[in-house]
């Protein structure tokens, strides 16, 4: 599948067609066990919607935040969507401004890329209102600035998939689509509890041993090779996290049981989605992923949490204008 960074369809290349635009950006799974801050893919059954209006005053302001993720800051500089638009506004020295309304569909501190979704949706909508809309690769730079507000660091593993769709390798300089068989599906289970990204990053401060880094590098290589060659056994051999998961798993009640339930249901691999507490698992078919969901959810029920589950292809689409 050819996925490239292009100007948004529906956005004029010469003049804005309106003074208001809306965009949707889905949830995403980041890290993917072997690619900390590098790999991610969308889960398009749930997401955030952002409405942006072009205003005469050269400023960026947030008019409202609605939906399931509350409370979130209305201060522009402290909000990922607001910070991303500020970065764009300052870089382009725009003579006009933006007012945005955010409708949150992604739970707060869920490991499902909620901060990235608001950020990318805001940028896509604002981009449609520029006199000369930018390519998405240009927007990615602003999105990195916005994401840093939520986690304290610039990383693109939740952002890249929303710009390109599908599994994406994300460095700070470029986004690289990774070919994945269309039959492969992801199960994502979100327990009804919170784990703040900053707290999840705190446990990673101690240095890692070189042999563990080598093992993780080999696992990443196996997963990427397995994707490109449509070889599920290569993915099975590599889709395990020896660096991040051992430190974060103790923060997530029920994680180990949930992971084992997925693996016993013939998952190619299962681990923490983003910073957690959500858990993802890869399967070779949709039916296998759907069949595994009840057992994974039961593990969180036993730990005292309600949960939600979604199944989507690993080739799911990213963000889009509405």
Curated annotation (Swiss-Prot):
Q: What pathway annotation does it carry? A: Amino-acid biosynthesis; L-threonine biosynthesis; L-threonine from L-aspartate: step 4/5
Q: In terms of one coarse class, where is the protein primarily found? A: cytoplasm
Q: Which GO terms describe its biological process?
A: threonine biosynthetic process
Quick one: which residues bind ATP?
Answer: 107-117
Known catalytic reactions? L-homoserine + ATP = O-phospho-L-homoserine + ADP + H(+)
User: What InterPro entries does the entry give?
Assistant: GHMP_kinase_C_dom, GHMP_kinase_C_sf, GHMP_kinase_N_dom, Homoserine_kinase, Ribosomal_Su5_D2-typ_SF, Ribsml_uS5_D2-typ_fold_subgr
Q: Which GO terms describe its cellular component?
A: cytoplasm
**EC numbers for this chain:** 2.7.1.39
Gene Ontology terms for molecular function: ATP binding; homoserine kinase activity
Q: Which HAMAP family would you find in this protein's record?
A: Homoser_kinase
Could you tell me what this protein is called? Homoserine kinase
List the source organism. Xylella fastidiosa (strain Temecula1 / ATCC 700964)
């Amino acid at each position: 599948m050819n996925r490239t960074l292009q100007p948004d369809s529906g956005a004029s290349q010469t003049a804005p067609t309106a003074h208001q635009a809306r965009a949707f950006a889905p949830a995403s799974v980041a890290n993917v066990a072997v690619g900390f801050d590098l790999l991610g893919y969308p889960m398009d059954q749930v997401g955030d919607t952002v409405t942006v209006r072009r205003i005469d005053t050269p400023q960026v302001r947030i008019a409202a935040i609605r939906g399931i993720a509350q409370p979130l800051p209305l201060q522009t500089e402290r909000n990922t969507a607001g910070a991303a638009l500020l970065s764009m506004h300052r870089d382009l020295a725009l003579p006009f401004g933006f007012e945005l309304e955010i409708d949150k569909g992604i739970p707060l501190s869920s490991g499902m890329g909620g901060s990235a979704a608001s950020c990318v949706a805001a940028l896509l909508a604002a981009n449609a209102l520029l006199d000369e809309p930018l390519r998405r690769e240009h927007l990615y730079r602003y999105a990195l600035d916005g994401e840093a507000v939520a986690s304290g660091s610039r990383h693109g593993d939740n952002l890249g998939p929303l710009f390109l769709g599908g599994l994406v390798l994300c460095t700070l300089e470029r986004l690289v689509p990774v070919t994945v068989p269309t039959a492969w599906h992801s199960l994502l289970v979100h327990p009804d509890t919170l784990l703040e990204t900053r707290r999840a990053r705190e446990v990673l401060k101690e240095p890692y041993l070189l042999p563990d880094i080598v093992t993780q590098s080999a696992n990443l290589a196996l997963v990427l090779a397995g994707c490109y060659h449509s070889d599920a056994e290569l993915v099975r051999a590599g889709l395990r996290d020896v660096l991040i998961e051992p430190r974060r798993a103790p923060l997530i009640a029920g994680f180990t049981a949930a992971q084992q339930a997925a693996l016993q249901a013939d998952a190619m691999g299962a681990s923490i989605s983003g910073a957690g507490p959500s858990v993802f698992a890869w399967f070779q078919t949709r039916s296998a992923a759907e069949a595994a969901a009840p057992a994974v959810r039961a593990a969180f029920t036993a730990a005292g949490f309600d949960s939600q589950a979604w199944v989507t292809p690993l080739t799911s689409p990213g963000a889009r204008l509405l």
